[in-house]
């Protein structure tokens, strides 16, 4: 008998997530859509994350412990390389999937085969409250990539595995590896966001978007520069002039990463 592979492979890279990991995993396992595998990759956590993960006995979980701490992007690309599903879904160890997230995303993607990537709106939890709705259409998302407006919530995305296998995440741009990937994917096919909150996104002082915000911003600027170069838009300007323009344009927002982004 041929082995039946799951429709979705959920990638969950973790590092020192002991406070939230049980709730995050449970929210995935309790999805109304059940045809998935949950690939958890631990990046040498030194807290209780591993022992808490091992308490789960669900057969859909595939747990891997890296021998060396090599970073978030490396974990994601490893997960892509071993994924068995037709679709890749993302999840983080401090967030919560709402019960119908997978069902609604997979239904949309299956009905719209030209769409290669699908995100959703989010609800903030933790140290920030409110809801955030992202640009919905392919054209709106392309425009947003060149501003400081939010484009996707990384842990909400689901897309075709073949696209992730073709492109992978680029470690050079970590911790803005997701933003850089989006700039490549919009040139490959259509991307969208569902106008529905399907994930609770936790904001806390130890998350990467807070602890490494300056590096994240700089690498997002470099991603934009790469696209401008490809489009030959920057022929009369130096790299330094373009990066300075992008930084200065967005300077008012750098002191508060969520300024003007949250819709209550």
Question: What are the functions of these language-model segments?
Answer:
Residues 19-22, 47-55, 96, 100:
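Acidic helix N-cap motif at the loop->helix transition within catalytic regions
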Residues 5-8, 29-40, 48, 59-62:
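Short loop->beta transition adjacent to catalytic acidic/histidine clusters or analogous donor-positioning motifs
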Residues 27, 42-51, 57, 68, ...:
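A conserved acidic beta->alpha catalytic loop
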